[in-house]
């Protein structure tokens, strides 16, 4: 099993204050999408972070060793062309997991 830190960077610094109705709907779809992966056991935790420099969300995901983590966001609503979101994925060198 491999673990990854995922950072989702918003399209603009003011996103949390001025998202449009369409963007708000997209974020609700994004949350539901990640919850579906959580139900499968691939998402450990996810959510928005109060970073004054730039709005972002983080998640910790786990994938079988032979699975490319990109499979998770290929259908994520926020990763559709034109949304302006960027994703950064960092493999964790080791992971200490509750209950292990």
Task: Outline where the language-model segments fall.
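Conserved, structured core segments of small domains
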Residues: 1-100
